[in-house]
Amino acid sequence: LRRARFPHDTICLLDGGNTLCGPDDGKAKDFEKKQLKEKAKLIVESYNRMGYQSMLVGHHDITLGLEILQECEKMAKFPFLSANMRYKDDNSRVFAPTTVVECKGLKVGVLGLTIDTIPEYYLERANPDRPLVLTKAIDEAKSLIPELRSQCDILVLLSANSAETNREIAAAVPGIDVIVDPLIELGNHKVWVDEELSMEQLGETLMVRTDAQGARLGTLDIDWIDGGRPMVSLSFDSAPPAGRSTYWYERASMEPHLLEDPDIMGLVEAFRKGSAFVNIDALPELPHKDKYLTASTCSMCHVEQTDFWKGTTHADAFASLVETGDQWRQDCIACHVLGYGQAFIAPEEAEPYKNVQCENCHGLNPGHPQDPVNHPWGAVKETSCLTCHNKNQTRIDFVFSRERRKVACPPLKRN
C-alpha cells in the first residue's frame, strides 16, 4: 500500500468482500467461533489502520452470523456496503447501499452488490430471528446508479456477482466507469486470475479483477478528464486521443520479502498469543475421543511404515505452524493434527495428536488392533486429502495420483 501511495497524494482503497470469514467458518463449533470472531475484528482494525474507505459485504462474511458481522461494522471506520442484502420481513436494507469518497479533488461514488444467487437457507441461518434475502443485483443497479451518478465524478461498482451478471449490468445500466469484480466461482474457487481475465472493456465500463485471498493487490491508476469517457488503457495506447481519460491497471504480488508493518504485526502477535487460551470449563464433551488410536499405537506393529512416515512432511505438520506462531489458531490447526475437535481441543491435551497421522488418511478403525482380520484398513481415498489439500487452504492445485506417492507408506508384508 505504501508503494501504491508513493506517487500519489491520495488513493481510494476498496475491498471486494468475503474478507472477514472463510467459506467453512459456518461449520465452526461454538468453541471455535470466539477465535474466528477475534480474527475478523483483527482484520477490521488492520483495515482501519491501512485507511480502507469501503468494503463490499460478501456471502462468506455472514457465515459466523449477521450479529458478529454487525459488531465488526461498528468497529470499522469505513462503511460496509450491500445494496441488495435485505431483511425478509420488511425488505429494509441491512447495510448502506452506496458511499461517496473524496479522492484528490474528485468524488468517487461506490455501489456494493452482493452475489444474488445464494440459497435461502444460507441467509436464514445467518440471522434466524430475522432472516435475510438478496434482491436481484441488476435491479438494484438500475434503481441506484442514476442518482449516485449525479453525486460523483467517477462511479465504481463493487459486485461479487458472476461475470455474466456483471456484463449484463454494464450493458443495461449506463454511467458505470469501473466494475471491481472479485471473481466469485462457487464450487470451484479460483485463487489466481489469468492475465487475460484481469481486465475487460464493456462499452464505456472497465471491469477489473484481482486474485483471491490477498494474493495480489490490484491498483487502477486513473488520469481523469471530465467528459473523457470511455477511459483508454495506457498499456495498449501510449498516445491516447485528446480529451480522453486514461488508466493503467496492474496487480502487485504480496511477496514474502515485503517488509511487515510493525503496527499490523503488533495486532497479529496479540491475536496469536490469545489463540492459545481455551476456557477448559466451557469445552464440550468429546464422545468420539476413544475411537482415536494415534500413531503411537500403530507404530507398535507397523515399524517400517512408521519409520517411513517420520521422513515425510506429514510428520512435521505441527512444527510448520509453530514456526509462524499459528499453532493454536482454530482455522489452521485442524489440518496439522489428528482429531481436533473430536479427540482434543485444549492445547495441553494436544501432544499425542500432533502432526498428520495414520488416521488422518486412513480413517478411524478402533477395532483393528484387537482384531485386524475382521477390521482391516481400507484404501486411502482422495476425499481424505481434499479436506485440507484444496485451493481454499493451499492456493495450489492438488493432484492425488502425484502427491500420494510422496506420503504412501511401504506395503505391508503379508504372512
State the predicted function of each range.
Residues 1-251:
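Acidic, metal/ion-coordinating pockets
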Residues 60-61, 229-232, 236-415:
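Short sequence/structural segments immediately N-terminal
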